[in-house]
């Protein structure tokens, strides 16, 4: 008798995706982050669902409803902190996942890569709107500053900002619509993630060598299910350590002060995972220029496949490209640090130099080094 998992219409889909899926035999731990992102997403949806049961999206009660969740709801504090710190781990996994894609040339699967970029933008939008919901000082002023950037768009800018706000300032209407979108977007992300997987399974996974591995495939289960289970265990351990020992480590203390439109915090800054983009935004004196640089800092990923000049897919055997890649990582860490600093000397010039270096590495140096490496190998 044929196994039900291979014949049943629904079980067959799961079987072909997670059990009998042919996978390269040499994929490393860097390939674990896809499954970890899936776990993060499900965790965020579940904790978010329970938070939404007790949260009220009204400017007068939003802050106190979060306090109520932490003080009065059974295990509300742990749900709230798992959701907040889960977002941080989500972004850590996202950045490592994208970094893996850049290093090993996974961007040569254009459909999967482009859906991934859309996913990145959607997750960033969701996280930004979620940060506004507790209605603390940084929530309010972060929302005001970031939405106000759209006013830099010529001609329609001001109307666009007021349309998003639902009035002449960030107020009740803004909070309500942000809650609505913050609730619906994770389900859109889930759908996009399924499409992302669908496109990936059309081509099969890349591997560290960048060489087609069709002649050497192994079943996903048990090899990679066990490997993913270990990753999940370590992710859970990291999350719970963060939640139970230092839940506010990655948050901003200003967000424990209720939102007050009459009192501006000394340093308005977003969550840590947006600081690199925020530093690029601030490093350009012109408002419109800054907004364009901000958008380009992420959307530049879309043209990475066009800038691939090397005859090898992966960076595994390309030491010069490896040096540039790690320089890019160091540069992004520098930008993250600068984004959290006040706008004063020497941080301004460091931010400007780091921003220039970021675009120079991706647009000029990496393609040039690819050509140099081809010539060194006489290819």
Swiss-Prot record:
The chain crosses the membrane at residues 33-53, 77-98, 113-133, 178-198, 226-246, 288-308, 320-340, 347-367. The keyword Chaperone does not apply. It comes from the Eukaryota. One of its GO terms (cellular component) is mitochondrial inner membrane. Its cofactor is heme b. Heme b b562 binds at residues 83, 182. It is a multi-pass membrane protein. Coiled coil: none annotated. Component of the ubiquinol-cytochrome c reductase complex (complex III or cytochrome b-c1 complex) that is part of the mitochondrial respiratory chain. The b-c1 complex mediates electron transfer from ubiquinol to cytochrome c. Contributes to the generation of a proton gradient across the mitochondrial membrane that is then used for ATP synthesis. This is Cytochrome b. It comes from Lontra felina.
